[in-house]
């Protein structure tokens, strides 16, 4: 009985490992048709009796404003070009902060956010965190930094039912993602921690202040020239 259970669990684990590797490899080239977060938002809207239509249009890397790319890095993950999926000092600082109580602070890199939004459900369990770490490692192993950021920008949530840079640019500013200004990009990046609560097009005092901070960080990073650091040659 025990040996049978072990064999079945081993087989299930093998299928999971193989399946997850295949998925990550496929999405290295193929645009994901959707994300786990999109499904979650759809289900939530049905349960709440307020069904929504998702707004989402995939745009390739070259059709997304460089200003938005840098703004997201400046606001969410300034070590993006240099780490392998995990910012250990930030994780340690977040754990120390959370142990002291108060508002819970996260330390997720852009790669971790892609792994979570693309493949996993919301939550803070250690099991989900373990899966997030697994997918993060796979993504960093098989994708270029440009691809990671491209998928992030096409799957990030920017409002109720609004996903991806193109839908966000049109919804908030009435322009294509390629035409976003630095200020508009900074405002979009500023709401990423809570895109349902905050609005990029009607910024609160806090969002306006955070957008200003992001613009200053963008300048310190070197602006669009920073993107040259995203070295795709290190990938398999």
UniProtKB/Swiss-Prot annotation:
Which pathway does the record list? Cell wall biogenesis; peptidoglycan biosynthesis
What cellular-component terms does GO give this entry? peptidoglycan-based cell wall; plasma membrane
Q: What is its EC number?
A: 2.4.99.28
Q: What GO annotations for molecular function exist for this entry?
A: pentosyltransferase activity; peptidoglycan glycosyltransferase activity
* Superkingdom of source: Bacteria
Q: What does this protein do?
A: Peptidoglycan polymerase that catalyzes glycan chain elongation from lipid-linked precursors.
Q: Which PANTHER family match?
A: BIOSYNTHETIC PEPTIDOGLYCAN TRANSGLYCOSYLASE, MONOFUNCTIONAL BIOSYNTHETIC PEPTIDOGLYCAN TRANSGLYCOSYLASE
What this protein is called in its record is Biosynthetic peptidoglycan transglycosylase
Which source organism?
A: Pseudomonas putida (strain ATCC 700007 / DSM 6899 / JCM 31910 / BCRC 17059 / LMG 24140 / F1)
